[in-house]
Amino acid sequence: MLHFGGFIMEINHISKILEKEREEYIRNKVEEYLKQGFSKDDAVNKANQSWRTYIGHRIQDVIYNLLKKFLKDSGLKVTTDKALNNRNLPEELDKVKRLIAINYGEYLFLPDADVIVYKVENNDIKIIAIISVKNSFRERRFETTYWKLKLKESPVTSHIKVFLATPDKDNEISYKCPNGKPKKMRIILEYELDGIYFLKEDFEETEKAKHFGKIVEDIIEISKKL
């Protein structure tokens, strides 16, 4: 029997680590830009821009490593779109890449698949879920929903679950109707995707919007049905 308390504790602990890391990162970057001759305001702005780029990749790495660690005993495997974009892939990852590719006539493209979970049984690969990691929703707000709809078009990929994982620091999608005003983005994302997982405690939980600590159990349950 699997226990997920440790996973939830690690998620909550990592959120605190990332916040502390942000303070140190911004401070160091501001000092770096000041030495380069930028004004204080410009240095702060550039440091914040640099952090937004950095944190997106950092959160993806955190999620990948946590899922790899906690899904290992279930026999499930985890990879990333970054790994799939490498040349000379091993046979297994090459098959994974082909099984999530979307056909555009003579072209094939990978969806927004930051993290991919799959299983191998009797040399047969089955894609279980794709996890899109978003730190901010200022740009490409509905990119993940677009890929979900494209995956549903083909019988080869229609079974793949598409999840969104986010810390949503600015509360852009944390609540459906804050102050009685419907949040279009939250409502559409929740409706179209198979699940939204928050890397924080303060959000409106529903059947499809949960704490990220529950994603391992959900993925394992889905894998049993495939």
Curated annotation (Swiss-Prot):
E.C. number(s) listed in UniProt: 3.1.21.4
Spell out the InterPro entries in the cross-references: RE_BsaWI
**A family per Pfam:** RE_BsaWI
**Is Heme among the key words of this record?**
no
GO MF terms listed in the record are: DNA binding; type II site-specific deoxyribonuclease activity
- Name the reaction it catalyses: Endonucleolytic cleavage of DNA to give specific double-stranded fragments with terminal 5'-phosphates
Keyword Manganese annotated: no
Its keywords, alphabetically, are: DNA-binding, Endonuclease, Hydrolase, Nuclease, Restriction system
The alphabetized list of GO BP terms reads: DNA restriction-modification system
Q: Look up the domain of life of the source.
A: Archaea
Q: Which family does it belong to?
A: Belongs to the BsaWI type II restriction endonuclease family.
- What is the stated purpose of this protein? A P subtype restriction enzyme that recognizes the double-stranded sequence 5'-CCGG-3'; the cleavage site is unknown.
Protein name in the entry? Putative type II restriction enzyme MjaVIP
Which organism is the protein's source? Methanocaldococcus jannaschii (strain ATCC 43067 / DSM 2661 / JAL-1 / JCM 10045 / NBRC 100440)
